[in-house]
Swiss-Prot record:
Induction: Induced under anergic conditions. Up-regulated during T-cell anergy induction following signaling through the T-cell antigen receptor. Upon viral infection.
Principal location listed in the UniProt entry: cytoplasm
Protein name (Swiss-Prot/TrEMBL): E3 ubiquitin-protein ligase RNF128
Top EC group: transferase
Stretches for region Disordered: 346-428
Physiological role: E3 ubiquitin-protein ligase that catalyzes 'Lys-27', 'Lys-48'- or 'Lys-63'-linked polyubiquitin chains formation and plays a role in different biological processes such as modulation of immune response, cytoskeletal dynamics or protein homeostasis. Inhibits IL2 and IL4 transcription, thereby playing an important role in the induction of the anergic phenotype, a long-term stable state of T-lymphocyte unresponsiveness to antigenic stimulation associated with the blockade of interleukin production.
Transmembrane segments: 208-228
Organism: Homo sapiens (Human)
Biased composition (Polar residues): 360-371
Membrane topology designation: Single-pass membrane protein
Length: 428
């Protein structure tokens, strides 16, 4: 029985996909001399088989051409032709006995042997190299080895290191059995072997299945990630779009609550000390329609309205008009609510008091310019003042008796009564 096909051509057994890729990469990088082939390459053989019945009055020849053979891995890539001759004896088809002989026909009317090819069956307990070497020693021009019974016309690239003197190919069992039966009936069979096509690495069914499954998994994972990523981007884009629409709607409401004013000759904005619009950098002129923001900065209406829709802040001081008008936007659901924060902690009351004072100053200043036509803003100022009174009441309800440390004892006696008086005032 011949050895299994070499691992250099087919990735069989425990060979993984990574090993197959490594072999293919090395095959692509390895330089090859003319007429040679890489370990992964497989060359087929074109077979021109003809049958002629000898010693008859009719010279009848039937031939067929097919690509049914495969060159051995160590075989020379050369064409060869000759009469097919099997080993002598019914049990010697494997040619594993070193004393196996071949009955070679001679040229008609002479004792000169014709060019012949040994027809040997695979198996018998010896290697391919043993069979090919025996045929070479008996004078064969080449060796044709046909496969096991039951393998039909399956072929493999043979590995026969050391037996490189003659051409060696493998053919299928059905093809070899047909030729052998014709020879046993006395029909002379001639075969012409020519070099066929070069094929890539031979991969077995398990490797093909593994590659297919891996490709499917990678493709499915890639498509799934792409769908997930696209859906996530679409969801974020929709949420951002809703947020922007809500903010623009709030900005429109806030802009509608801001005062408009038409400048007239004699206004301080037009005088020698007048300012220019910070958006268009142009001086104010009579009959210009300006927008007055909550921070008392004025701009051309046509200049500042588009800015407020996008940014909702003063172009100069970055004052948020939504917060100044008491509009708080919830980022999560985009809802609008009027919120006045009141802190119960003494540590936060001071900062809240300062912020509310600034807000009150800006609102009162804006109210002084706007006049009495904006009742919602006055209500907001009143609610803010009430909140400030609540915070101040909570801050005044707590007192701590602390006598600070005085570094100079000379003035300690004089300062103590004043400090005690200040503490009593805090308690009251």
């Amino acid at each position: 029985m011949g050895p299994p096909p070499g691992a250099g051509v087919s990735c069989r057994g425990g060979c993984g996909f990574s090993r197959l890729l490594a072999w293919c990469f090395l095959l692509a990088l390895s330089p090859q001399a003319p007429g040679s082939r890489g370990a992964e390459a497989v060359w087929t053989a074109y077979l021109n088989v003809s049958w002629r019945v000898p010693h008859t009055g009719v010279n009848r020849t039937v031939w067929e051409l097919s690509e049914e053979g495969v060159y051995g891995q160590d075989s020379p890539l050369e064409p060869v032709a000759g009469v097919l001759v099997p080993p002598d004896g019914p049990g010697a088809l494997n040619a594993c006995n070193p004393h196996t002989n071949f009955t070679v026909p001679t040229v008609w009317g002479s004792t000169v042997q014709v060019s012949w090819l040994a027809l040997i069956q695979r198996g018998g307990g010896c290697t391919f190299a043993d069979k090919i070497h025996l045929a070479y020693e008996r004078g064969a021009s080449g060796a044709v080895i046909f496969n096991f019974p039951g393998t039909r016309n399956e072929v493999i690239p043979m590995s026969h290191p050391g037996a490189v003197d003659i051409v060696a190919i493998m053919i299928g069992n059905l093809k070899g059995t047909k030729i052998l039966q014709s020879i046993q009936r006395g029909i002379q069979v001639t075969m012409v072997i020519e070099v066929g096509k070069k094929h890539g690495p031979w991969v077995n069914h398990y490797s093909i299945f593994f590659v297919s499954v891996s490709f499917f998994i990678i493709t499915a994972a890639t498509v799934g990630y792409f769908i997930f990523y696209s859906a996530r981007r679409l969801r974020n884009a929709r949420a951002q779009s809703r947020k922007q629409r809500q903010l623009k709607a709030d900005a429109k409401k806030a802009i509608g609550r801001l005062q408009l004013r038409t400048l007239k000759q004699g206004d301080k904005e037009i005088g020698p000390d007048g300012d220019s619009c910070a958006v268009c950098i142009e001086l104010y002129k009579p009959n210009d329609l300006v927008r007055i923001l909550t921070c008392n900065h004025i701009f051309h209406k046509t200049c500042v309205d588009p800015w407020l829709l996008e940014h909702r802040t003063c172009p100069m001081c970055k004052c948020d008009i939504l917060k100044a008008l008491g509009i708080e936007v919830d980022v999560e659901d985009g809802s609008v609510s009027l919120q006045v924060p009141v802190s119960n902690e003494i540590s936060n009351s001071a900062s809240s008091h300062e912020e509310d004072n600034r807000s009150e100053t800006a609102s009162s200043g804006y109210a002084s310019v706007q006049g009495t036509d904006e009742p919602p803003l006055e209500e907001h100022v009143q609610s803010t003042n009430e909140s400030l009174q609540l915070v101040n009441h909570e801050a005044n309800s707590v007192a701590v008796d602390v006598i600070p440390h005085v570094d100079n004892p000379t003035f300690e006696e004089d300062e103590t009564p004043n400090q005690e008086t200040a503490v009593r005032e805090i308690k009251s």
